Amino acid sequence: MMYREPSDSPWGVVVRCDTLCTGVYSVSTAGHGGIMVQTDAARRLLSPEAQAVGFQAGRYLNFEEDCDAPVVLRELVDSGIIAPRTDNYFRPGEYEACIDRSLQRWNPAYWRARQKRLSVQAAKATKELVERSILRGR
């Protein structure tokens, strides 16, 4: 699949485009913006719950900047694809806390699904650790 920064968006002509990772773009227009994820990249990088938040327009799954873009950011940070931002504005941990507050307010169903997924992953990891410890003890 060929990846190319978008020049047009559901919010208008793109005046700035930052590539977050292959197939994922943070775009700004004269008046608005968001995150645009090429459809095949969305299927590969985002959970079904995250995909459900976006809206399809052309070859992109789109996430409006005010409420829905944090869904993509949370997924990319969780998977280690991007690092949490730290700079003069965000000290360590503050960027993720900001994303989480936004998700809890604007996308509570996604937040609950994410928390459930993390709990299941933690339980699975604990079970595997216990099983390995038991096998070593034999």
Predicted regions and their residues:
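Short, compact, well-ordered microdomains
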Residues: 66-122
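A short, exposed loop/beta-hairpin motif centered on an aromatic-Gly-Thr core
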Residues: 55-65
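Basic, alpha-helical nucleic-acid-binding regions used in initiation and control of genome expression
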Residues: 50-51, 110-134
